């Protein structure tokens, strides 16, 4: 069976086509605040793939999600749009109001939750998201601006100092303003993760574009990089869909 999986984030649209659980096609594109237009341009391609089911993860608002549903109806196949539940597939949400938890974070936790397993899941995307899960209990988490959002905020609010792009590649004290900014921002996020990991023994799972960068500085915790963690969570969600 061929299935289409969509991950519609704040800035990118990613899709996977799988056949018998094997990924046979994968792509990711910036949607420039118009994900429905980007999806519309892909529909003809999807129509020729003999896809039999589509699973969707979308962080968009209700209006945009309605447009996404409308476009996907052109495929004339069953569609499942994932949402956060108080409890689903044995996993219990740690938020007081589950609807406030991002679907991307929920699916990432769903992908790693197992009995007798404590996991810290770090999403290294537009924001740095941190979620803790013990067995099948989601314990809540943290959201921080990512490396680039912090740098941009500093540039916008610091008069007289120009901070050009540079690499986030070192935790040593900077010997010029550019390095001091980049090393300082990276140190702040790495230190946050280290503090959380020191509070209780747990497995560290990293996902998202900057996962390899953070893994480089978190080697004592033996980080596991999972590029397609959301896909695994979405597949798990669809397998255990509610009637």
From Swiss-Prot:
Binding site for substrate: 95, 102-105, 177
GO biological process: coenzyme A biosynthetic process
Cofactor(s) required, per the database record: NH4(+); K(+)
Pathway(s) the chain acts in: Cofactor biosynthesis; coenzyme A biosynthesis; CoA from (R)-pantothenate: step 1/5
Enzyme Commission (EC) number: 2.7.1.33
Active site per database record: 104
Annotated Gene Ontology cellular component terms: cytoplasm
Cysteine pairs bridged by disulfides in the record: none
Pfam families: Pan_kinase (PF03309)
Kinase found in the keyword field: yes
GO MF annotation, one: ATP binding
Catalytic activities: (R)-pantothenate + ATP = (R)-4'-phosphopantothenate + ADP + H(+)
Entries under InterPro entries matching the protein: ATPase_NBD, Type_III_PanK
Binding residues for ATP: 7-14, 126
Top-level taxonomic group: Bacteria
Keyword Cytoplasm: yes
First-listed, main subcellular location of the protein, grouped into a coarse class: cytoplasm
Keywords noted in UniProt: ATP-binding, Coenzyme A biosynthesis, Cytoplasm, Kinase, Nucleotide-binding, Potassium, Transferase
Subcellular location: Cytoplasm
Cofactor, how bound (note): A monovalent cation. Ammonium or potassium.
The protein's role, per its UniProt record: Catalyzes the phosphorylation of pantothenate (Pan), the first step in CoA biosynthesis.
Listed PANTHER family: TYPE III PANTOTHENATE KINASE
Family: Belongs to the type III pantothenate kinase family.
Record text on subunit structure and interactions: Homodimer.
Name of the protein this chain belongs to: Type III pantothenate kinase
């Amino acid at each position: 069976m061929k299935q289409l999986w969509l991950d519609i984030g704040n800035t990118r649209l990613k899709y996977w086509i799988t056949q018998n659980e094997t990924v046979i096609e994968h792509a990711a594109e910036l949607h420039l605040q118009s994900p429905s237009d980007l999806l519309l341009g892909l529909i003809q391609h999807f129509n020729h793939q003999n896809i039999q089911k589509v699973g969707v993860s979308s962080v968009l608002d209700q209006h945009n999600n309605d447009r996404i549903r409308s476009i996907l109806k052109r495929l004339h196949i069953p569609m499942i749009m994932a949402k956060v539940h108080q409890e689903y597939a044995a996993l219990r949400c740690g938020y007081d109001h589950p609807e406030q938890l991002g679907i991307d974070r929920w699916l990432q936790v769903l992908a790693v939750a197992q009995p007798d397993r404590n996991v810290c899941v770090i999403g290294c995307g537009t924001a740095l998201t941190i979620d803790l899960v013990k067995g099948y209990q989601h314990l809540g988490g943290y959201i921080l601006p990512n490396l680039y959002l912090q740098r941009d905020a500093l540039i916008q609010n610091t008069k007289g100092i120009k901070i050009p792009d540079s690499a986030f590649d070192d935790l040593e004290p900077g010997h010029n303003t550019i390095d001091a900014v980049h090393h300082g921002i990276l140190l702040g996020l790495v230190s946050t993760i280290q503090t959380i990991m020191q509070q209780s023994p747990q497995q560290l799972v990293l996902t998202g574009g900057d996962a390899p960068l953070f893994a480089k500085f978190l080697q004592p915790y033996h980080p596991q990089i999972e590029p397609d963690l959301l896909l695994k969570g979405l597949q798990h969600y669809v397998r255990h869909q509610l009637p």
